[in-house]
């Protein structure tokens, strides 16, 4: 009995080590793209800002900056421009231009004091993470988001490997993680410069699936509740990250 326990423990440690290696390989391959960019900064950087390879990236980064500055969504003139502007909708030029009325003293004081009413839940999770990590990168939001990509895009490998290990096919979990992270579509959408929600769109569903599996295999009511809470939390974070409620409903249907 003791020998079986030791063998199982050794197998678990060996699998954990190999799984960690697969995760690091995925991280380093993506980070190597950034190192290649640094060799030709004139082509890939504007000052200290790395270029973006998706149109959504400046959108998330701007919201991260506005959240830190306390002006989140106070002005949203860049969204839906020019079709969202009143002038465009009216399809005519204004007859005259007038200055806006000067703000009262009380309103000026309230604006200068920032916007303490901004809730973290109102900010997309990707922007929230970048906003809080940007001080570690000298408030360079572009660099912060870029360096998050290799780690976040590779995270799904860990719960995927653990899932297949728990059902008795660990090799499938390891190969699935490696094939998945370097699959053409996912690799393209999670490469350096793609600051977008694709980075964690595999991680949260796979994590929820793992926790549901663990809840089904749990021996005590306490563990069932803990794993179920974890699954609910992962789906909550997925909703905050991607804002597509259909995925959560699909899990309830299953």
Q: Where are each of the predicted segments found?
A:
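Membrane-embedded, hydrophobic transmembrane alpha-helices
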Residues: 1-16, 114-118, 124-128, 144-146, ...
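Start-transfer (signal-anchor) and selected internal transmembrane alpha helices
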Residues: 1-44, 166, 174
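Membrane-interface coil-to-helix junctions
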Residues: 24-154, 183, 196, 203
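Membrane-embedded helix bundles of polyisoprenyl
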Residues: 26, 34, 147-163, 171-254
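General nucleic-acid-binding
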Residues: 52, 161, 168
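Secondary-structure transition/capping motifs at alpha-helix termini
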Residues: 136-140, 165-171
């Amino acid at each position: 009995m003791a020998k079986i326990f030791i063998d199982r423990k050794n197998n678990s440690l060996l699998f954990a080590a190999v799984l960690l290696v697969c995760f690091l390989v995925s991280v380093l391959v993506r980070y190597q793209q950034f190192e290649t960019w640094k060799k030709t900064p004139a082509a890939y950087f504007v000052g200290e800002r790395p270029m973006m390879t998706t149109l959504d990236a400046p959108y998330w980064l701007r919201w991260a900056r506005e959240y830190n500055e306390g002006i989140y969504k106070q002005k949203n003139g860049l969204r839906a421009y020019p079709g969202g502007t009143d002038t465009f909708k009216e399809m005519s030029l204004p007859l005259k231009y007038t200055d806006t009325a000067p703000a009262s003293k009380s309103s000026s004081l309230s604006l200068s004091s920032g916007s303490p009413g901004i809730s973290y839940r109102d900010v997309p999770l990707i922007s929230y993470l970048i906003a809080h990590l940007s001080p570690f990168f000298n408030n360079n939001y572009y660099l912060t988001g870029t360096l998050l990509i290799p780690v976040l895009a590779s995270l799904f490998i860990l719960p995927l490997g653990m899932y297949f290990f728990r059902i008795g096919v660990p090799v499938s979990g390891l190969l699935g993680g490696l094939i998945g992270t370097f699959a053409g579509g996912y690799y393209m959408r999670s490469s350096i410069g793609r600051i977008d929600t694709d980075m964690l769109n595999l991680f949260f569903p796979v994590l929820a699936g793992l926790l549901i599996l663990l809840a089904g295999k749990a021996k005590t009511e306490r563990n069932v509740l803990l794993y179920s809470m974890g699954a609910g939390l992962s789906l909550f974070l997925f909703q905050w990250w991607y804002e597509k409620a259909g995925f959560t409903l699909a899990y309830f249907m299953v």
